[in-house]
Structures are given as structure tokens and as C-alpha cells.
């Protein structure tokens, strides 16, 4: 067996026994290679035309694969704070799991380091069977909120709001910051959306 006209896709080769082996090179768009194979045996010769199509694959993020319930999946994971770009060479149906940043915990004000509220969890959005067309998609990943981002006197040492995560025209909202505690008589700080409120410490 030998390829006598045309060529195999890049990265593939044919042995004299007719076996095609190798890993095809990545392509930016679906690519079809047409070639002619000639087989010779006992002074007889036969030819036949074949074609192989290499399908372009999406790119972006940290890529991994897994088989779940007998179905093979490819995962593209984007991390905070950089996010990234998801490149799709052709229309596909995908599943999207988007997690926003959690809110930061509140901070104590005063001598007693207790009573601060925990930050709220970041929002989670799940979209299955989501149809998207070819293109470049910007993915934003919300970071966790900072501690004591908002401060207005003793009573409000609240944690910062978690960042939103965005992509494919949907938004997962970041968690609210936890309320700060108070040890000086001004009262505990309230928590943001999903964040725990602060507590009053001491007798001042």
C-alpha cells in the first residue's frame, strides 16, 4: 500500500500494510484531505480514492478530558483573575458552568476579635445544551472579595463583594461581603447579599 496521489492530513502516515497511524495536527477550521492509495500484490495493482476530515476543536483555558456515563467530554477551565478567551471554530452545543467569586469576610473593630460575619457564596449558573456559533468569546472570572473593603467608622468593616463571572451573555453574581463586628458602641455592620451580619462585642 502506498499513497500515490494527494496527501494524508498532517501528522498521519500510512504503513506498507495499509495502516494509517499518528495524531493529526491541530487545524483552525475543518479540513478535508483527499488522497489515492495504490495496492500492489502478485503483480496486480488496484487504486482507490479516500478522504479524511479533521474537525477543528475549540481552544482556550486549561483543557482536560473525561468520560462520564460512557460519554466523552472535553473541559475548558478558566480561573480568576485572568479569565481568558474561548475560541470556537464552528457552531456547537456546549454545557456551561459559571461560578462567581465569594464575598470577603468582615473584620472586627476593637479589642475583641470575634463577631465578624462570613462572606456569601458566589452565584452559580448552569446551562446545558447551550447553542453557540463560531467566534471568540471573552470569559470573565470573578475573584473573591477582599476583607474590610468598605469602612465607614467603627460599625462597618464589611467584607468586599465577590466579583461577577461573565461569558456567553450570562452573568453569575458575586457573593456579598460579611458584616464587620463592633466593640465601641456604634453597632454591628450589616452583611451584603448572602453575607452574614456582624455582631456587637463588649459593653461599650
Would you name each region that the model predicts?
Residues 29-42:
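A short beta-strand micro-motif common to beta-rich folds, especially ectodomain repeats
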Amino acid at each position: 500500500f502506498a499513497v500515490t496521489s494527494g496527501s494524508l492530513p498532517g501528522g498521519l502516515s500510512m504503513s506498507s500494510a495499509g495502516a494509517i497511524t499518528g495524531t493529526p495536527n491541530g487545524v483552525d477550521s475543518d479540513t478535508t484531505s483527499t488522497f489515492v492509495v495504490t495496492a500492489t500484490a502478485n503483480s496486480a495493482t488496484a487504486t482507490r480514492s479516500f478522504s479524511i476530515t479533521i474537525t477543528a476543536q475549540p481552544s482556550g483555558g486549561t483543557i482536560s478530558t473525561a468520560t462520564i456515563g460512557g460519554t466523552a467530554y472535553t473541559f475548558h477551565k478558566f480561573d480568576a483573575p485572568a479569565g481568558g478567551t474561548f475560541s470556537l471554530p464552528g457552531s456547537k452545543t456546549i454545557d456551561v458552568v459559571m461560578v462567581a467569586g465569594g464575598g470577603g469576610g468582615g473584620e472586627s473593630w476593637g479589642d475583641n476579635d470575634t463577631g465578624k460575619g462570613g462572606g456569601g457564596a458566589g452565584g452559580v449558573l448552569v446551562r446545558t445544551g447551550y447553542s453557540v456559533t463560531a467566534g471568540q468569546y471573552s470569559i470573565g472570572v470573578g475573584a473573591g472579595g477582599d476583607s474590610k473593603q468598605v469602612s465607614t467608622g467603627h460599625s462597618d468593616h464589611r467584607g468586599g463583594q465577590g466579583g461577577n463571572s461573565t461569558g456567553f451573555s450570562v452573568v453569575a453574581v458575586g457573593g456579598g461581603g460579611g458584616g464587620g463586628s463592633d466593640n465601641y458602641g456604634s453597632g454591628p455592620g450589616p452583611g451584603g447579599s448572602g453575607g452574614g451580619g456582624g455582631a456587637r462585642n463588649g459593653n461599650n
